[in-house]
Regions:
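RNase H-like (RuvC/DEDD) metal-dependent nuclease/polynucleotide-processing core
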Residues: 2-17, 21-322
Length: 322
Protein backbone atom coordinates (compact mmCIF):
# COMPACT_ATOMS: atom_id res chain seq x y z
CA UNK A 1 0.00 0.00 0.00
CA UNK A 2 2.90 2.35 0.60
CA UNK A 3 5.58 3.82 -1.57
CA UNK A 4 8.58 1.50 -1.39
CA UNK A 5 11.26 4.18 -1.36
CA UNK A 6 11.56 7.04 1.10
CA UNK A 7 12.59 10.34 -0.43
CA UNK A 8 12.50 13.96 0.76
CA UNK A 9 9.55 16.05 -0.33
CA UNK A 10 10.62 18.30 -3.24
CA UNK A 11 9.37 21.49 -1.57
CA UNK A 12 9.64 21.23 2.23
CA UNK A 13 7.04 23.29 4.12
CA UNK A 14 7.95 26.51 5.88
CA UNK A 15 6.33 25.20 9.06
CA UNK A 16 5.76 21.72 10.44
CA UNK A 17 3.61 21.38 13.55
CA UNK A 18 2.13 18.55 15.56
CA UNK A 19 -0.63 18.65 18.15
CA UNK A 20 -1.06 16.08 20.88
CA UNK A 21 -4.84 16.15 21.22
CA UNK A 22 -7.21 15.67 24.14
CA UNK A 23 -10.83 16.36 24.96
CA UNK A 24 -9.41 18.43 27.83
CA UNK A 25 -8.08 21.72 26.40
CA UNK A 26 -5.47 21.87 29.18
CA UNK A 27 -3.99 18.61 27.88
CA UNK A 28 -3.43 19.79 24.30
CA UNK A 29 0.13 20.61 23.29
CA UNK A 30 1.61 21.72 19.97
CA UNK A 31 5.24 21.42 18.87
CA UNK A 32 6.57 23.32 15.86
CA UNK A 33 9.60 23.43 13.59
CA UNK A 34 10.43 26.36 11.33
CA UNK A 35 12.43 26.10 8.12
CA UNK A 36 15.41 28.43 8.15
CA UNK A 37 16.95 30.35 5.24
CA UNK A 38 19.60 27.64 4.81
CA UNK A 39 16.91 24.96 4.41
CA UNK A 40 17.38 23.38 7.84
CA UNK A 41 14.68 23.18 10.51
CA UNK A 42 14.67 24.58 14.02
CA UNK A 43 12.36 22.76 16.44
CA UNK A 44 10.77 24.60 19.35
CA UNK A 45 9.57 23.32 22.70
CA UNK A 46 5.84 22.47 22.87
CA UNK A 47 3.29 25.04 23.94
CA UNK A 48 -0.43 24.87 24.75
CA UNK A 49 -2.64 24.69 21.66
CA UNK A 50 -4.81 27.44 23.21
CA UNK A 51 -7.75 28.88 21.24
CA UNK A 52 -9.12 26.78 18.38
CA UNK A 53 -10.93 29.42 16.28
CA UNK A 54 -7.68 31.11 15.24
CA UNK A 55 -5.34 28.08 15.28
CA UNK A 56 -5.03 27.81 11.51
CA UNK A 57 -4.68 31.58 11.16
CA UNK A 58 -1.75 31.42 13.58
CA UNK A 59 -0.18 28.62 11.57
CA UNK A 60 -0.52 30.63 8.36
CA UNK A 61 1.10 33.63 10.01
CA UNK A 62 3.99 31.49 11.26
CA UNK A 63 4.49 30.00 7.79
CA UNK A 64 4.72 33.49 6.29
CA UNK A 65 3.20 34.99 3.16
CA UNK A 66 2.95 32.36 0.44
CA UNK A 67 4.29 29.69 2.79
CA UNK A 68 3.03 26.18 3.43
CA UNK A 69 2.34 24.58 6.80
CA UNK A 70 2.07 20.83 7.44
CA UNK A 71 -0.07 20.24 10.53
CA UNK A 72 -0.37 16.83 12.20
CA UNK A 73 -3.07 15.68 14.61
CA UNK A 74 -3.04 12.44 16.56
CA UNK A 75 -6.75 11.72 16.15
CA UNK A 76 -8.33 9.72 13.31
CA UNK A 77 -9.19 11.41 10.04
CA UNK A 78 -11.43 9.10 8.06
CA UNK A 79 -14.17 6.49 8.43
CA UNK A 80 -14.14 2.68 8.38
CA UNK A 81 -15.17 1.57 4.90
CA UNK A 82 -17.91 -0.76 6.17
CA UNK A 83 -19.59 2.09 8.03
CA UNK A 84 -19.20 4.42 5.05
CA UNK A 85 -20.83 1.84 2.78
CA UNK A 86 -23.74 1.37 5.17
CA UNK A 87 -24.17 5.14 5.50
CA UNK A 88 -23.79 5.67 1.72
CA UNK A 89 -20.79 7.93 2.17
CA UNK A 90 -18.58 8.18 -0.91
CA UNK A 91 -16.08 10.80 0.31
CA UNK A 92 -14.98 11.67 3.82
CA UNK A 93 -14.09 15.36 3.55
CA UNK A 94 -17.37 16.61 2.01
CA UNK A 95 -19.25 14.52 4.58
CA UNK A 96 -17.15 15.93 7.43
CA UNK A 97 -18.44 19.40 6.59
CA UNK A 98 -22.01 18.16 7.17
CA UNK A 99 -21.55 16.13 10.35
CA UNK A 100 -23.42 17.54 13.34
CA UNK A 101 -25.97 19.22 11.07
CA UNK A 102 -29.26 18.32 9.42
CA UNK A 103 -29.75 14.56 9.09
CA UNK A 104 -26.33 14.14 10.74
CA UNK A 105 -27.23 16.28 13.76
CA UNK A 106 -26.79 13.46 16.31
CA UNK A 107 -23.54 12.15 14.81
CA UNK A 108 -21.30 13.52 17.58
CA UNK A 109 -23.59 12.41 20.44
CA UNK A 110 -22.41 9.04 21.77
CA UNK A 111 -25.32 6.63 22.06
CA UNK A 112 -26.48 6.10 25.64
CA UNK A 113 -27.58 2.54 24.95
CA UNK A 114 -27.36 0.08 22.09
CA UNK A 115 -30.82 0.96 20.78
CA UNK A 116 -29.63 4.48 19.89
CA UNK A 117 -26.69 3.35 17.73
CA UNK A 118 -27.11 3.96 14.00
CA UNK A 119 -24.94 4.79 11.00
CA UNK A 120 -25.75 8.45 11.64
CA UNK A 121 -25.06 8.12 15.39
CA UNK A 122 -22.20 5.61 15.52
CA UNK A 123 -20.18 6.67 18.59
CA UNK A 124 -20.79 4.47 21.64
CA UNK A 125 -21.16 4.41 24.61
CA UNK A 126 -21.94 7.62 26.45
CA UNK A 127 -20.87 6.01 29.74
CA UNK A 128 -19.65 2.62 31.01
CA UNK A 129 -21.91 -0.10 32.31
CA UNK A 130 -23.18 -3.11 30.39
CA UNK A 131 -21.64 -1.95 27.12
CA UNK A 132 -19.88 -4.12 24.56
CA UNK A 133 -18.23 -3.55 21.21
CA UNK A 134 -20.56 -6.24 19.90
CA UNK A 135 -23.39 -3.74 20.34
CA UNK A 136 -21.68 -1.53 17.74
CA UNK A 137 -21.11 -4.45 15.38
CA UNK A 138 -24.75 -5.52 15.56
CA UNK A 139 -26.33 -2.06 15.38
CA UNK A 140 -24.18 -0.95 12.44
CA UNK A 141 -24.82 -4.19 10.58
CA UNK A 142 -21.14 -5.11 10.37
CA UNK A 143 -19.87 -8.58 9.57
CA UNK A 144 -17.45 -8.66 12.50
CA UNK A 145 -15.07 -6.76 14.76
CA UNK A 146 -12.62 -6.15 11.91
CA UNK A 147 -15.18 -3.88 10.23
CA UNK A 148 -14.87 -1.40 13.10
CA UNK A 149 -11.29 -0.67 12.04
CA UNK A 150 -9.83 1.27 9.17
CA UNK A 151 -6.96 -0.46 7.38
CA UNK A 152 -4.42 1.90 8.97
CA UNK A 153 -5.73 1.03 12.45
CA UNK A 154 -4.64 -2.58 12.13
CA UNK A 155 -1.50 -3.80 13.94
CA UNK A 156 1.92 -3.27 12.37
CA UNK A 157 5.33 -4.73 13.13
CA UNK A 158 5.96 -1.72 15.40
CA UNK A 159 2.72 -1.55 17.39
CA UNK A 160 -0.55 -3.24 18.20
CA UNK A 161 -3.90 -2.31 16.70
CA UNK A 162 -5.26 1.16 17.31
CA UNK A 163 -8.61 1.50 19.03
CA UNK A 164 -11.64 1.54 16.68
CA UNK A 165 -12.92 5.00 15.84
CA UNK A 166 -16.45 4.73 17.21
CA UNK A 167 -15.62 3.16 20.59
CA UNK A 168 -15.47 5.76 23.38
CA UNK A 169 -14.36 3.82 26.48
CA UNK A 170 -10.95 3.00 27.93
CA UNK A 171 -7.50 4.55 28.12
CA UNK A 172 -6.71 3.74 24.48
CA UNK A 173 -10.00 4.92 22.96
CA UNK A 174 -9.83 7.58 20.25
CA UNK A 175 -13.54 8.22 19.73
CA UNK A 176 -13.87 11.19 22.05
CA UNK A 177 -10.72 12.83 20.67
CA UNK A 178 -12.09 12.40 17.13
CA UNK A 179 -15.40 13.96 18.15
CA UNK A 180 -13.61 16.94 19.69
CA UNK A 181 -11.15 17.37 16.84
CA UNK A 182 -13.71 17.07 14.06
CA UNK A 183 -16.60 18.97 15.67
CA UNK A 184 -14.66 21.78 17.33
CA UNK A 185 -11.78 22.34 14.89
CA UNK A 186 -11.57 20.58 11.54
CA UNK A 187 -15.21 20.74 10.36
CA UNK A 188 -15.70 24.44 11.22
CA UNK A 189 -12.39 25.27 9.54
CA UNK A 190 -13.39 23.39 6.38
CA UNK A 191 -16.71 25.21 6.25
CA UNK A 192 -15.06 28.62 6.54
CA UNK A 193 -11.96 27.92 4.43
CA UNK A 194 -12.41 25.59 1.44
CA UNK A 195 -8.68 25.90 0.66
CA UNK A 196 -7.77 23.81 3.72
CA UNK A 197 -6.45 20.43 2.52
CA UNK A 198 -6.35 17.05 4.24
CA UNK A 199 -3.94 14.28 3.24
CA UNK A 200 -4.49 11.84 1.57
CA UNK A 201 -8.05 12.84 0.62
CA UNK A 202 -7.08 15.97 -1.29
CA UNK A 203 -4.02 14.67 -3.12
CA UNK A 204 -0.49 13.41 -2.74
CA UNK A 205 1.58 14.95 0.02
CA UNK A 206 4.37 16.28 -2.20
CA UNK A 207 1.87 17.91 -4.56
CA UNK A 208 -0.05 19.59 -1.75
CA UNK A 209 3.11 20.84 -0.06
CA UNK A 210 4.13 22.53 -3.31
CA UNK A 211 1.20 24.95 -2.94
CA UNK A 212 0.74 27.70 -0.32
CA UNK A 213 -1.64 27.04 2.55
CA UNK A 214 -2.20 24.42 5.21
CA UNK A 215 -2.07 20.66 4.78
CA UNK A 216 -3.48 18.50 7.58
CA UNK A 217 -2.35 14.92 8.21
CA UNK A 218 -3.21 12.20 10.70
CA UNK A 219 -0.35 10.98 12.88
CA UNK A 220 0.15 8.23 15.44
CA UNK A 221 2.95 8.89 17.97
CA UNK A 222 2.98 5.23 19.04
CA UNK A 223 3.92 4.36 15.45
CA UNK A 224 6.58 7.08 15.45
CA UNK A 225 8.19 5.60 18.58
CA UNK A 226 9.34 2.72 16.40
CA UNK A 227 10.31 4.94 13.46
CA UNK A 228 12.61 6.91 15.76
CA UNK A 229 14.05 3.83 17.47
CA UNK A 230 12.80 4.76 20.94
CA UNK A 231 12.88 2.36 23.85
CA UNK A 232 9.58 3.69 25.14
CA UNK A 233 7.98 1.47 22.50
CA UNK A 234 9.03 -1.56 24.57
CA UNK A 235 6.14 -3.19 26.41
CA UNK A 236 7.38 -2.45 29.93
CA UNK A 237 7.91 1.26 29.23
CA UNK A 238 5.31 4.03 29.48
CA UNK A 239 5.16 7.63 28.31
CA UNK A 240 3.35 8.34 31.60
CA UNK A 241 6.61 7.72 33.46
CA UNK A 242 9.01 10.70 33.39
CA UNK A 243 11.98 8.39 33.95
CA UNK A 244 11.06 6.34 30.89
CA UNK A 245 10.77 9.53 28.84
CA UNK A 246 14.20 10.60 30.09
CA UNK A 247 15.64 7.23 29.08
CA UNK A 248 15.04 8.16 25.43
CA UNK A 249 16.58 11.65 25.67
CA UNK A 250 19.88 10.59 24.13
CA UNK A 251 18.15 8.85 21.24
CA UNK A 252 16.02 11.91 20.48
CA UNK A 253 19.00 14.27 20.65
CA UNK A 254 21.07 11.94 18.45
CA UNK A 255 18.24 11.70 15.92
CA UNK A 256 18.01 15.49 15.73
CA UNK A 257 21.78 15.84 15.30
CA UNK A 258 21.93 13.20 12.54
CA UNK A 259 19.19 14.96 10.63
CA UNK A 260 20.64 18.43 11.22
CA UNK A 261 17.58 19.58 13.15
CA UNK A 262 18.42 22.50 15.38
CA UNK A 263 16.71 22.42 18.76
CA UNK A 264 15.86 25.46 20.80
CA UNK A 265 17.55 25.60 24.18
CA UNK A 266 14.20 25.09 25.89
CA UNK A 267 13.42 21.98 23.83
CA UNK A 268 16.86 20.49 24.49
CA UNK A 269 16.36 21.02 28.22
CA UNK A 270 12.87 19.51 28.10
CA UNK A 271 14.08 16.42 26.25
CA UNK A 272 16.91 15.86 28.73
CA UNK A 273 14.47 16.29 31.61
CA UNK A 274 11.88 13.89 30.16
CA UNK A 275 9.52 16.86 29.85
CA UNK A 276 9.28 17.18 33.60
CA UNK A 277 7.12 15.54 36.23
CA UNK A 278 4.00 17.66 35.71
CA UNK A 279 0.69 16.29 34.42
CA UNK A 280 1.35 17.78 30.97
CA UNK A 281 4.69 15.98 30.52
CA UNK A 282 3.26 13.09 28.51
CA UNK A 283 1.37 15.53 26.24
CA UNK A 284 4.43 17.64 25.52
CA UNK A 285 6.47 14.48 24.95
CA UNK A 286 4.02 13.10 22.38
CA UNK A 287 3.71 16.50 20.69
CA UNK A 288 7.48 16.43 20.17
CA UNK A 289 7.51 12.79 19.04
CA UNK A 290 4.81 13.62 16.53
CA UNK A 291 6.83 16.56 15.23
CA UNK A 292 10.00 14.47 14.89
CA UNK A 293 8.05 11.72 13.15
CA UNK A 294 6.68 14.23 10.64
CA UNK A 295 10.15 15.69 10.07
CA UNK A 296 11.38 12.14 9.48
CA UNK A 297 8.91 11.85 6.59
CA UNK A 298 9.55 15.31 5.13
CA UNK A 299 13.32 14.74 5.19
CA UNK A 300 13.00 11.39 3.43
CA UNK A 301 14.03 9.18 6.34
CA UNK A 302 10.64 7.46 6.26
CA UNK A 303 8.15 6.74 3.46
CA UNK A 304 5.29 9.20 3.21
CA UNK A 305 2.86 6.29 3.10
CA UNK A 306 0.88 7.27 0.01
CA UNK A 307 -2.00 4.76 -0.14
CA UNK A 308 -2.87 3.21 -3.49
CA UNK A 309 -6.32 1.94 -2.46
CA UNK A 310 -8.91 4.44 -3.76
CA UNK A 311 -11.24 3.68 -0.83
CA UNK A 312 -8.46 4.65 1.57
CA UNK A 313 -7.83 7.86 -0.37
CA UNK A 314 -11.51 8.84 -0.45
CA UNK A 315 -12.94 7.50 2.80
CA UNK A 316 -10.67 5.77 5.31
CA UNK A 317 -7.61 8.01 5.35
CA UNK A 318 -4.10 6.99 6.33
CA UNK A 319 -1.45 7.63 8.97
CA UNK A 320 1.54 9.70 7.85
CA UNK A 321 4.67 7.58 7.50
CA UNK A 322 2.87 4.24 7.77
Amino acid sequence: MNALTARPVPQPPALIAHADWSTNPKKRAIARALRMADGSYTALTPEPVSGLPDLFARLRAAAGAGGTALMGFDFPLGLPRAHAKAARIDRFVPTLRQLGRGSWKAFYDPAEDASQISVRRPFYPQRPGGTKRQHLIDALGLSGAQDLFRHCDRPTDLRGAASPLFWTLGAQQVGKAAISGWRDLIAPALRSDPSLRIWPFDGRLAEMLSQPGIVIAETYPSEFYGHLGLQIAVSNKSKLNPAHRRDDAGRLLDWAARNEIRLSGALTADIRDGFGTGPDGEDRFDATIGLFGMLNVVLGQRVQGEPADPVVRRIEGWILGL
